[in-house]
Each structure stands twice: as structure tokens, then as C-alpha cells.
Amino acid sequence: VSRLKDVRAEYDSTGQRLLLNVPREWVSARVTPFSGQMARSTPHFGKGALLNYDFYTNHTEHSGGQASLWHELRYFDDRGSLSSTGYVRKNLSGGSGQQEGYVRYDTTLMITDEEDATTWTAGDVISDALSWSSSVRMGGISYGRDFSLRPDLVTWPLPEFSGEAAVPTSVDLFVNGYRAGSTRLQPGPFTLTNLPYINGAGDAVLVTTDALGRQVSTTMPFYVTSDLLRQGLSDGAMTLGSLRRNYGIENFDYGPAAGSGSYRYGLTDWLTLEGHVEGAEKLALGGAGTIVKLGRLGVVNSAWTQSKMRGDTGGQLNWGYQYSTNAFSITTQHSRRDRGFGNLALYDQPTIYDEYNQPIASLSRNTDQYSLTFNLGDFGNVGAAWIGVQSFDDQKTELLNLSWSRNLWGSSSIYLAASRDQQQGDWTVALSLQIPLGERDSAAITLENTPDAGSTQRLNYNHSMPTDGGFSWNMAWARQSQASNYQQATLG
């Protein structure tokens, strides 16, 4: 053994041990989970049925009264669940103008597979969509990934910290100044994985302590975002069926056949690929996008979609940027569309343009969103957002939103918001104070001032339903400058 290059051997006769010193590169890095991974739970299946319902009645001086009953019926066993929702409405007096009778919302059969984290759905379904595509209601079948079935899985890449220990060592991890935990290491190279869930930009400090109490600290910056998929992980769904028409008005009104599919794949820990397709008899749409982490500088997303619907072709371009820390965050999102762009959300419209070739139903031409938030510590949180939308007939909508919130004593909080319509030049202001009263009771005081309704003062008291059964109730009172005062009470 001593003849090997850079190897030193020493025999400990007392301990009957052969001690070897070998080159560092000979020792493979030991992967050490930093903290205990969330244990994968074994689902417990039962068999049964339930009925959820909500009864509501009201009476107004001018429009009369009405009563409505909403319901959810559900049957479940170890294979899945079957549910149906809807409501029945009855006009009690006067001419309220509301539709009477029964209206069905959704009837859905769902089968889940926790091992593969997938779900089969049949009946009334909603197609899967990405941040740059649209979802639609359909009657048909859907199959796709459902990570909510596996809460033990972390779908986005978490940082790994590597180093080397010469002697048995303990390691403490501090993230953004807070101690996140500790673990023990044996001599040799190491890689710490399974770190606590973190998001945004920050600094991690590794403090190693040997048996003699000597400490060495190493600072390592990181940027984590849940928008990415971990390398090798995929996500997606496919939906086939007929487009749902007049949802919430007609019970069984379905239109032409259509299909939709979305897919995401984590190519690397800093690059996630996305794709989306839609199709019908006179519609073909396809799009591709990326989410890229720029090291510690944030995340950029982009996507391009091309469509052809009833002979019209068009494109859609989306892009954005996000950056967040524990002190502030900034987000921008933008979209640009051609006039001929179409998708399933527009496909079943009776007509897209009027007799003057102006759009009746269309997506916006340009959309721009900017948001900025600051964490002021003991002084609360401040946020600002600007949204601009331009239609194909050059109509513009520009909104400015400002907000401030702060925790007060106990779990109480105060919230102040103001918004301005740039075209109208009007401000809307709201101030709200939330005060918890015990475990299940809370009170709220709200002051509002809007251009249309004037000033409004509201008092609200809420009692939530006990977990072991019972009733919940709510009482509200409001005084309005441009309308009659009102009182309201609910029992559930």
C-alpha cells in the first residue's frame, strides 16, 4: 500500500487499525440530507357519501325576494370520487328577473394515482393551461400530473452546498440570518442536500465546528424559484371533449369537439421548457416557452404561440422577469398579439367581429404589468402595481394600485389600498382593520370611497364553524352616502 503514489500508511497496533492517508480526489463526496425529508404518507381510503348545501334568501324593497339552494353531492371510495354541483332558485315575490329552476354546474368522475401523481377526470372538466395560455370548460376526459397528491415531493430545484471536512464535524446552516438547522458530518468531501424550503435570493452561511470547538464559516449566495421544475421532472395534462356553453345558465349545452394539452420539462436546474397545443375542426394552435434562471439575478420567462382559426392566422408573444428577496420583489409581465390570433376561448363564439369589422370577442392587443413590493419590517409591507391593457380598437385601460399592510397586536392587522383609473382620473380608497376575537370569532371595520358609490362604512362580525360540528354565522351593517343603509345576517 505504501508504494502507491501520495498514499501514507500507518499501523496502530494497540487499536488493531490500519490508518491510510489518501489523496483528496480519491474520496467521493458524501451526499448528506441536511434535514429529515418529509415522510411520504400512505393514503387511507374510505367509502362514503356527503352532501354540502348552502341556503340563501333575501328580500329587497324594489325587486322583491328570492330563495336559492346550492348543493354538492359526492360519493367516494378507494377508486376515486363522483361529484355533482348545482343550485335551484325560486322567486318569492315581485319581479326579480332572476332565472328560476334548477341549474347544474359540474358532474365529475375523478380517479387518482398517488404513486405516479396523476389524475384521470371525466365529465365536466377544465383544461390545463400555462401562464401564457388560456383554459376552457369542456365536457370530456382529462389526464395529467397532479403533484398535490405527493406533498413529500419538492418539484423545484433547491440549492446544494459542498465542502470538505478533515475531522468529524457538525454543521449549522443560517439562511438570511436565521438558523435553519444542523447536521453531523464525517471526514471527507460532502454535499448537503434536502435543504429547508426557501424562495428568492439570499445568503446561506455554513458554520462548521470540529471536536476542539474550532469554527469556520462560509457564505454562499443562492437564488431559488418555484417557477422552475427540478432537472428531469415533467408536468403536463391533456383534455379531449366538447366545449361547454352557457355555463351557469344551461344544464347540458355543449359545443364543438376540441382538444388541449400542456407540457413542462425540467431540462436543467436553471432551464424549464414549456409547450402548449390546442385543436378543433377549424383551429390549430401551438406554442413553446422557456423559464430561465439568470444565476442570482432572477428569472426570465418567454413564450411564442402561433394559431390559425377559420382562415385567420396570428401570433402571441409573452415575456416577463421576476426577482425577489426577503426585503423586496419586482415582477413584470408583457404580452403582444396579432389581430388574427385565436384560441379555444374564442373558438365557440357566435361571431368575433361586428358589421364594421370591430372585435366583439377578442383578447387584448397589448398587456403590460409591473409590480414592486417592499418589506419594511416593523413598519409593514408596501406594494405598487401598474396594469395597462390596449384593445384592438385602441381602447386603453390603465390602473395604478398602491397598498400598505401591517400586523398590529396579536393577530390583528390593518390594510390600506388606493387605486387610480388613469383614463377617468378617479381614485378608489379603502381602509380595513381586522381584529380576531378568540379562536373562532373576528370583527372587521372597513371604510371605502369610490367614484360611483361614494363613501361607505362597514362593520362585520364573523363566527366560524367549529371543527367538531356546529354552526357558523355572520352579521354585517353598512352606511352608504349614495344608497340606503343595509343590515345582513347569515347562518350556516
Where do the model's predicted regions map?
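Short, charged low-complexity linker/loop segments at the C-terminal edge of domains
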Residues: 26-30, 437-443
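Short strand-turn segments of transmembrane beta-barrel domains in outer membranes
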Residues: 51-60, 238-239, 444-450
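Outer-membrane beta-barrel channel domains
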Residues: 1-49, 54-58, 62-232, 291-295, ...
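Compositionally biased low-complexity segments at domain edges in trafficked proteins
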Residues: 231-263, 456
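Feature captures outer-membrane beta-barrel proteins of Gram-negative bacteria and organelles
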Residues: 41-42, 67-78, 98-114, 255-269, ...
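Extended, compositionally simple hydrophobic/Ser/Thr-rich segments
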Residues: 170-171, 248-250, 273, 299-301
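Acidic/polar residues at beta-strand termini and the immediately following turn/coil
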Residues: 10-14, 280, 421, 450, ...
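Outer membrane beta-barrel transmembrane domains
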Residues: 343-405
